[in-house]
Amino acid sequence: SAGVEVDNVTVVGDSQYNDTVNGKTQFPTVADPRGTDLNQAFIQYQVREHQIKVGRQKIGLGNERFVGSVGWRQNEQTFDAVRYQTNLGDDWRFDYSLSNKVHRVFGSESAQGQWQSDLHLVDLHYKIAASSQFKFYFYSLDFQAAPLMSNQTIGVDYQHIGEFGLVQWQLFTALATQQEVGAQPMDFRANYKNIELQLTRGVFQAAFGYETLGSNNGVGFMTPLATLHKYQGFADKFLVTPSGGINDGQIKLGYKRKNWDVGVQYHWLSSAVGEINYGNELDLNVAYSFDDQYSVLLKMANYDAEQLATDTTKVW
């Protein structure tokens, strides 16, 4: 099979925001510059449990904390890559991607719109049981155009789903370590930790989590290819990890019933080293689906700065 996808971003009215290429740096950033891009163009072949995909494509690994397509942005992140996936027996799954260019959300007119790269992305999934699984991963990211973003990460995730009476619960934990690779001029070794407990009863959900992106030698643990909008608040104040790293304590509440999907979350954000209180953020989203094709979404982010950045409110 094969696929081709083109996207176009057009601004309606006056853009009172910094889209990263319009020069309006006095406004908060909304990284959706106007333009037309070839988003995907690939061929794909599958035989039994083996699948290979060649060309420009989206790559989303797991929860997209390290590699994703940044689906919230109007122009998605894609990769010129070869990707191979296969099952190794009943319990193991192998996923490897090799890429030499990243097409980022900023579009072709931006100096940061494309990164020449040498990427090796390896995921190895192991299913212990229907309710439990591990993921082992190795990501080597070498960027010629952005050497300070070059890094090599090795880590493991664990996920378990269970029930306690009428409550379904899900535990997610992750540990990783990161160091310099390729063009990176800095020597560092930073760690990553994440734990989240999610509870669901009927139409209500609650989640409690604590995530740490550590720091070493003045370099914060970085995830330049992640779907970053999903993490550390919708205001996007932490797209680049500060030199002191980040601690993110968070509470999320949700309600899903029929056509409605409502969520609220609160983040306590501070440095991983140095005891710096960055600020707090409150996020809200309300979505209504008319059918399988049409929906509306209201979304709000309010970042209350303490010792990093400035107070910011965004509404979509």
Region spans (language model):
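Transmembrane beta-barrel domains of Gram-negative outer membranes and organellar outer membranes
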Residues: 1-49, 80, 90-91, 250-254, ...
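Flexible internal linker/loop segments at domain or repeat junctions
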Residues: 219-244
